[in-house]
Amino acid sequence: SIPLSFFGGIGAASKCGILIKGSNYLEALAQTEIVVFDKTGTLTKGEFAVAEIKPENNISSAELLEIAAHLEAFSAHPIAVSIKKAYGKKPDLQRVSDVRDYFGKGVCGSFDKDEIVLGNAQIMRDKKVKVPEVNSTGTIVYVLKNGHYLGCIIIEDKIKDDAPSA
């Protein structure tokens, strides 16, 4: 009767579109309290967009976005593309120099002769700059100018209309 219950559980999950490879996985699921999905392009559209711009220290949202878009001008990364799209203009490449990519962290470079750092919390820690905690469901891109925090840009991916609700 125990094998029958495993077949029944695996079959019921299959009817809901969930593949369980075997009874040992089904047993492990019985102890599960939290499930996290990271399925860009499956549950989400895979189209990142700027959801919010949070400037600080006497800078406007437009200025913060302009700085970020210029530093991301050479990148094809989805986050960079979303920032450039939100900016809506072609960046003036003469204003940008010495751009360096820090894989998985962000980018650094010069914009109008100012040193700019754009990236996640890890690169901010690496630069020994304390940034405010931001409660957001999206990806947070922090912006520094000459070592001073300017604000952040929140990037989000949209959930597909036909994605099942969790």
What does each model-found stretch correspond to?
Residues 1-166:
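Cytosolic catalytic headpiece of P-type ATPases
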